Amino acid sequence: DEHGDSLAFTGSINESLTAWKNNFERFKVFLSWDRPRDVEEEQEAFDRLWENAEPGWATVNLPEAVKQDLIKYAPNEPPTVEPGLGPVVEESIKSRWIAQFLRDAPYLVQDGWKVGVETAALDPFPHQRSVAYDVLSQFPCKKLLADEVGLGKTIEVGLILRSLLLSGRINNCLLLVPRSLVKQWQEELRDKFLVDAPFYDGSKFVYFEGNTTRSEPLPSGRDPWRVHRVTLASAQMAKMSGRSEALLNSGEWDLVILDEAHHARRRDFATLNRYRPNRLLRLMEGLTERTKALLLMTATPMQVHPIEVYDLLRLLGLPEKWQDPHSFMEYITSLRETDDTTWGTVFSLLDSSIEHWGVDKSWEESCGRALGPVGRQRILNAIDFGNTSAVYSFKDSEREWLRQLMRRQQPVPWMTYRSTRPLLRQYFDQGLLKQN
């Protein structure tokens, strides 16, 4: 139109008797001001057909078609049954209603994104459902999933991804995993969550089907990172020179997921003044600027040095005052309850944390019961006004509650989900696990 806006549509709305009884009809409309890339792709596909440049298709203008008498190739009688179709198997009306409801429900009810969690082909543990709900209620967000091995981080991500796709809250997702886990990821997403995640190996798309594989060539003229809604790739391939640049230049993402995120790390820890990220960490620094949401997965966020945790949290978006690695490490050191606590740094970072996330509700309630509202407010006022000298006039009980606040207000509890193996024992005791 006069404003440069356009729309594109694909599909058909066939209202014949055959279509109503036998077909699945789909009609999609894309708006340039909402999904410009989709409009561009439809335009490019049409142009290839129109210009006779699409492999396997021939485009002939009408005068030429008349001249060649192409109509003679049409059958004398219209087909009554489409070639290749077997007998139509009638399905129950109830099943069709249920299937249609699952497609429509996320758009019809409040918190419709829960439909994806509750209709997955498994019954998640309480902590898995809790993580999925929390991420989905905050989406788009950037979080670290750090459950211990065996607690189901993959299940949590599958629930989240299924819900986001079913509710239309994301249009694209990049999933980076170790090469050795690609097959497991693809099969688990398909079998448990009905999420199709083609594996892009750098030259083609691969589908694992039991003991066999099926390959799909890359479409000509299209960015391979933008062909499918969910793209599964190995982190090893993505971080390679040349590959990483192409990935970073491919555009914005709605969601990026990195499994075994602890492999994104700096090369040495001898001094904080020398920052040398490895290729994966450098890639993730670029991707976090190009995605609305980010999920990092690792059971071991710290392997050698606490600065490894800082590097992962920085990808998720630390509050401003926490972004300095020296201040971060000073604060972490202060949690050990030593006599040389740098209260100026601690109060500055605490104030930044409270401003960013608010006061931890559990601490606020428990401290209020233990010290009363006046004692609790003495602690909060000292932090708010940066009155570090007040610490030395605190009672022992007030100082202990200050220490508890320091532990709860650091970024890790706010940005990380972590469940540990003793939780499995609780599930066993509650009858949620059949064997220990």
Regions found by a protein language model. Give the residues of each.
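Charged, low-complexity
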Residues: 53-143, 228-230, 235, 251-254
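SF2 helicase/translocase NTPase motor core
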Residues: 107-127, 133, 154-156, 162-286, ...
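Short hydrophobic/aromatic beta-strand immediately N-terminal to the Walker A/P-loop
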Residues: 143-146, 174, 295
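Conserved helicase ATPase motor motifs in RecA-like P-loop NTPase domains
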Residues: 288-305
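A short helix-turn-beta junction within AAA+ P-loop NTPase domains corresponding to the substrate/partner-engaging
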Residues: 309-322
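Conserved helicase/translocase motor-coupling segment
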Residues: 379-436
